[in-house]
Amino acid sequence: MCIRDRFIFFQIILGAFLAGLDGGLIYNTWPDMNGKFLPDDVSIASFFSSESFNTPSIIQFIHRKMAYILFILILYLNIVYIYKKLPIINILLFDLAVLFQIFLGVITLLSGAKIFYASLHQIGSIIVVSSFLYICYKNINTNLQPSN
């Protein structure tokens, strides 16, 4: 498992924590968090507290920033695909799934976590993982696979 894989699964776990803590009901602005980079009720020290995974604003902050990091990693993956002259169709499904997931995440947030959008966003995570597994399968014989 390479770092990109870990980021995807960590992002899904953060989303599960966020849903469980009803974190989508707070800070319903985007791209900032009520006009600020860091939420009002969070300090840098609180990130290192034992309660950090019970604080919805911290989870939402990390979930948002992880999404940006994942987007950059996926852009890099696309560049590698083009550079190695691999069939772009293999990664197109993954790209579309990720873009749709980002769109759903923003819509879910701006809607105040309406159940329809929140459910679609959770289903979208399954589609992202499935499409990622598909490109891993399609590239099993290339050097894009991480070494153990």
Name the predicted role of every residue range.
Residues 78-94:
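Membrane-interface helix-loop-helix junctions at transmembrane boundaries of multi-pass membrane enzymes
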Residues 130-148:
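A juxtamembrane structural motif centered on a specific transmembrane helix
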Residues 51-61, 85-89, 109-119:
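Juxtamembrane loop-transmembrane helix junctions in multi-pass integral membrane proteins
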Residues 12-70, 75, 79:
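Membrane-interfacial catalytic/cofactor-binding modules of polytopic membrane enzymes
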Residues 65-70, 120-128:
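Membrane-embedded alpha-helical segments of multi-pass membrane proteins
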Residues 8-13, 97-106:
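Aromatic-anchored segments of alpha-helical transmembrane domains
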Residues 1-3:
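Short, small-residue-biased leader/transition segments that mark boundaries at the very start
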Residues 18-28, 102-126:
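Interfacial helix-loop-helix junctions of multi-pass membrane proteins
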